[in-house]
Amino acid sequence: MKIAVDAMGGDNAPQVIIEGVEEARDLYPDLEFDLYGNPDKVKPLIKNNERLNIVATSEEISMGEEPVRAIRRKKDSSIVRAATAVKEGKADAFFSAGNTGAILAAGLFIVGRIKGIDRPGLTSILPIAKPGASRHNFVYLDTGANAESKEKNLEQYAYLGKFYAENVLGVANPRIALLNNGAEEDKGDKLHKEVWQILNSKDDLNFVGNIESGDLLFGKADVVVSDGWTANAALKATEGTAKMMMTLIKDGILHGGLRAKLGYLMLKPVFHQIGQKMSASTYGGAVLLGLKAPVVKTHGSADALAVKNTISQIRTMLKTGVIEKTVEFFDSTENLDNSQKNE
């Protein structure tokens, strides 16, 4: 299995990209890597070139560039070349920590959509915070690929999320929920009410109804489906709340006197465990589901651990054949039309 890597994408590239790739290479003997980037910057960072191949590129797409224009103009950029390698069958998957919009555009216009998918959805794995939960994470999409969605898009996301949860997370018959402003059936705008009816009518989906943003991290669903605008806003609010709580805790320890500092020392292992559980580096990257091959992006500030874990995630996708199974399902749109519940 070969992964095309954008070695130049990310705030700390190419150093952390190379470090993470080498850690993954040492862990998985069945993986090979093509590193797309500037050889003068990439080669000195490689400790062992076993199963690593540098593919020279002369251009980079920066974080601030307009995505579609960039991939059209910078044909020799690391993002475009890596995505093209996947399209041409020279690699099995594409990984980057670079410009999110450019990665999405390259995935959509170069790698291409699966037949039957109208709009691919950006899919993240989020932690479950509920103590004693049977699972530690869940699938969340669309987290920002599409600001506006139609009923059919969210229906497709439910199936994409189902296949991903089954094959990558190993969840049998995953519970699927719709992100909404209330748990009741009649909540939401016209779009969400219609999507609720559609998902509830499918006998091959384990639809458990609406879920509110406040319940996202409490293990009530294995797959949460939403339009990109709502899902991204809820995700950012959750991240902001977590940061605020950590800031308040640190401030309380710093200004709380000796007793607070002693309490912190006693609870330090607990804080470390919580930090690991909530860290984005633990859960890999965001997948643009609905494409003909794995296209996976990790956050721009990713460290080597995040890179390694994202590559592990890609490997699982390749080994389980989740894309092939998704293609097989969507190859005939009759699958969606014929999956109505018996009334």
From Swiss-Prot:
Family to which this protein belongs: Belongs to the PlsX family.
Gene Ontology CC, one term: cytoplasm
Biological process terms in GO annotation: fatty acid biosynthetic process; phospholipid biosynthetic process
Protein name: Phosphate acyltransferase
Segment forming the signal sequence: none
Catalytic activity, as annotated: a fatty acyl-[ACP] + phosphate = an acyl phosphate + holo-[ACP]
PANTHER family: FATTY ACID/PHOSPHOLIPID SYNTHESIS PROTEIN PLSX, PHOSPHATE ACYLTRANSFERASE
Role this protein plays: Catalyzes the reversible formation of acyl-phosphate (acyl-PO(4)) from acyl-[acyl-carrier-protein] (acyl-ACP). This enzyme utilizes acyl-ACP as fatty acyl donor, but not acyl-CoA.
Compartments it resides in: Cytoplasm
Known pathway: Lipid metabolism; phospholipid metabolism
Assembly: Homodimer. Probably interacts with PlsY.
GO molecular function, one term: phosphate:acyl-[acyl carrier protein] acyltransferase activity
Acyltransferase as UniProt keyword: no
UniProt keyword Nucleotide-binding, yes or no: no
Source organism (scientific name): Limosilactobacillus reuteri (strain DSM 20016)
NCBIfam families membership: plsX
Gene: plsX
Entry's EC annotation: 2.3.1.274
Pfam families: FA_synthesis
Superkingdom, taxonomy of origin: Bacteria
UniProt KW keywords: Cytoplasm, Lipid biosynthesis, Lipid metabolism, Phospholipid biosynthesis, Phospholipid metabolism, Transferase
